């Protein structure tokens, strides 16, 4: 394993661990009740938060692609800082709703950006994406450790002081995360393509999402993964309430769910998800876990089933993310990846309403059947997507010929001798081909070095 890759990603790992130290999360509902929230006002806050994230996710991804992914993550941490400050200073519902909306900006800015950073860094350092799942898995492990530690420490801190204090103690961790992000050497692949207008970039991003069936299929798969995962984290505790679980169980239960993000990251790097039997096993066990939730009245079985479900979803999310990154060029990678988050929110809102209605009318366990339906569709999409990706990885003659044609045109491209029509075609090919983009970057670097050498030679005295 390349040592330079480990050293380069070390600041990113530190930043993600610090960013996960949000100490107020475990006591948020307690604090909200203290400042006057009712079930109705909680719904208003959730609606405001849910409206912000999907609206900003794709635009923030395009910002990351055109400007700086590191800079976008710094802005995300600033959003977390501002949200925590407003939340900690809140004494009424209206102010806290503003804090929740700013937190939505934080999630929108970070959605899809970290995955794109890791993928391009691995690609730059190793020349392939083979180690992507290993390193994004390590990122998820570090992030999970931050979540678990903050979940336990936040409760202890609130008990010793107050829930409000947890908001302010979060601030130094978010500030330290900004410093760590600034120390990270961001990959440059997404900047090597010839700059295009914002309008062209947006058109290419949405065109890739809407007109390429394999990309649309992967986005739907990731959206289903996100919807199910969010359903587990948002509605999972209701099973414990329905089964009259003791209060002492909620802390370890939540820590177990948080730990699945890290364990899932570890397993995603170890499991060979290009093998059909393993993929089919995931596609079968995932809905089986939801069936247990629908049928059992055992508290232990519910906790185990939810933990297994969250773990499997974490594994699938990482592999599906790699398939998506493999399918799109670096220049639009963060924007397209953010589209999965947007689609997840669009699916989750009606799904959450359906879960709430079924839970109220027929009891919480019956909502497990809705999860089963979504899990079956997820399993089918997973199998189809992996098989499709396997076929797509075989060398294709037309693409090879297109790359050879571009190599023949490089001289005219660098000399500015291409006609506008040919130049547009070359730029379109570069936007979809990381290999040719890297080749052109190396040629330009060589030409610049030769130019500097020639200038130095001319200036030498006789």
Language-model regions: role of each:
Residues 1-6, 185-220:
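Juxtamembrane intracellular "pre-TM" segments in multi-pass secondary transporters
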């Amino acid at each position: 394993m390349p040592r330079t890759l480990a050293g380069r990603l070390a600041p990113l790992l530190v930043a993600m661990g610090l960013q996960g130290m949000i100490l107020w999360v475990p006591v948020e509902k307690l604090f909200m009740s203290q400042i006057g929230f009712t079930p109705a006002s909680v719904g208003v806050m959730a609606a405001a938060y849910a409206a912000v994230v999907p609206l900003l996710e794709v635009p923030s991804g395009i910002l990351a692609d055109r400007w700086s992914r590191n800079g976008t993550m710094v802005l995300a941490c600033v959003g977390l800082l501002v949200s925590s400050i407003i939340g900690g200073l809140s004494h009424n519902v209206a102010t806290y709703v503003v804090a929740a909306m700013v937190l939505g900006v934080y999630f929108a800015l970070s959605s899809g950006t970290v995955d794109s950073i890791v993928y391009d860094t691995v690609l730059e350092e190793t020349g392939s994406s083979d180690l992507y799942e290993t390193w994004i898995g390590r990122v998820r492990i570090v992030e999970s450790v931050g979540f678990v530690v903050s979940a336990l420490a936040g409760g202890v801190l609130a008990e010793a002081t107050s829930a409000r204090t947890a908001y302010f103690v979060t601030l130094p961790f978010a500030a330290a995360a900004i410093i760590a992000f600034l120390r990270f050497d961001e990959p440059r692949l997404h900047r090597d393509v010839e700059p295009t207008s914002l309008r062209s970039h947006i058109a290419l991003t949405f065109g890739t999402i809407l007109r390429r069936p394999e990309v649309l299929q992967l986005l739907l798969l990731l959206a289903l993964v996100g919807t199910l995962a969010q359903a587990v984290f948002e509605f999972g505790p209701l099973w414990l309430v329905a089964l009259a679980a003791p209060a002492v169980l909620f802390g370890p239960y939540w820590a177990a769910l948080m730990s699945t993000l890290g364990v899932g990251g570890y397993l995603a790097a170890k499991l060979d998800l290009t093998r059909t039997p393993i993929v089919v096993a995931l596609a079968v066990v995932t809905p089986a876990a939801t069936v247990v939730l629908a049928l059992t009245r055992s508290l232990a079985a519910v906790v185990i089933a939810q933990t297994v479900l969250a773990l499997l979803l974490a594994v699938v999310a990482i592999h599906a993310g790699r398939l998506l990154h493999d399918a799109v060029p670096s220049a639009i990678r963060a924007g397209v990846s953010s589209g999965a988050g947007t689609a997840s929110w669009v699916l989750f809102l009606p799904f959450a309403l359906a879960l709430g209605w079924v839970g109220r009318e027929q009891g919480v366990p019956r909502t497990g059947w809705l999860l089963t339906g979504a899990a079956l569709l997820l399993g089918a999409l997973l199998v189809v997507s992996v098989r499709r990706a396997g076929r797509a990885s075989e060398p294709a003659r037309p693409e090879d010929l297109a790359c050879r044609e571009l190599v023949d045109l490089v001289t005219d491209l660098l000399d500015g001798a291409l006609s506008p029509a040919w130049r547009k075609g070359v730029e379109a090919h570069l936007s979809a081909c990381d290999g040719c983009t890297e080749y052109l970057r190396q040629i330009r670097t060589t030409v610049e070095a030769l130019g500097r050498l020639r200038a130095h030679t001319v200036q030498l005295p006789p």
